[in-house]
């Protein structure tokens, strides 16, 4: 199952811009480098998985100056991942 979402905020610039349409799959098959919708701080946010261990993920925005993420909040339980962005796929150059 998948659904359309609109990107909100600037935390994923330059990969994803505010107002851009994305397709999110409810797949549980995600890994390092994937962009996911994750439930954190009582809301859903778009972030990139940068590390995984013991059922937890470390997520970061591509734009660190505009992102509240695991760098401030710590590891996130992976069951808080709502889905994975399946389109458009954007890799951060030089990292994944």
Where are these predicted regions, by residue range?
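Extended hydrophobic leader/signal-anchor segments used for secretion and membrane insertion
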Residues: 1-96
């Amino acid at each position: 199952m998948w659904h359309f979402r609109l990107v909100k905020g600037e935390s994923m610039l330059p990969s994803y811009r505010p107002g851009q349409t994305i397709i999110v799959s409810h797949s549980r098959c995600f890994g390092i480098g994937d962009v996911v919708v994750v439930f954190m701080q009582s809301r859903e946010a778009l972030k990139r998985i940068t590390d995984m261990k013991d059922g937890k993920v470390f997520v970061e925005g591509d734009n660190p100056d505009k992102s509240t993420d695991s760098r401030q909040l710590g590891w996130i339980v992976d069951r808080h991942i709502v889905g994975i962005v399946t389109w458009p796929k954007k890799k951060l150059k030089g990292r994944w």
